[in-house]
Amino acid sequence: VAASRLVLRIGVPFENAWLPRMAQLAPAAKVVDLRDGLTMRPVDLPPGAAPGTGGTPDPHVWLAPPLVMRMADRIRDELIALRPEAKTEFEANHARFIADLKALDGDIRSRLAAKKVRNFMVYHPSWGYFADAYGLRQMPVEAGWKEPGPRTLQMVIEGARQSGVRVVFVQPQFSQKEAETIAQAIGGEVVAVDPLAPDYIGNLRRVADIFARNLQ
């Protein structure tokens, strides 16, 4: 760590805890915020939640391939500035990754293009940038990392019924209790999708397939 010359951050909350320590261990390292130049969105909230409850901005920028392409450009440029002798290698790696991202982006668009119901319900609001990129709308259950109260839960259920939602998406890192309650109330089901899976390309293909099978 002490020999690090470049630190890339993406804006997830835990970075705020370790970046000061990183600055002590590697004082010469350049810190690059990959969100710079991106249009950030607020965190989506369930009905009845107070503005700002979820914190802002939404940190989940990596779930939109078009935004990841822009971040990849920045990483390439920073690496070339750091090691100009490896420019050819960095550019080749970048080109392959961008080609994979473009193929992924096109595949997701084709899978979701014909869906008439564009709303989907999630327990934790991780998928806002993904929704923006592909013309969808996420409807969250949770606000500010807190479980919904009875009033919010009822409003969420009514919103799901009015929007034609039949699936509640959850991620493995969170409790499924409230999601199962909502699914039972709307005659739907709970389906797991993981925004933190290590295989980025493969995972988003699986997520797109899950969305395509569960959106009407």
Residue ranges and their predicted role:
Residues 1-216:
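Extracytoplasmic metal-acquisition and chelation regions
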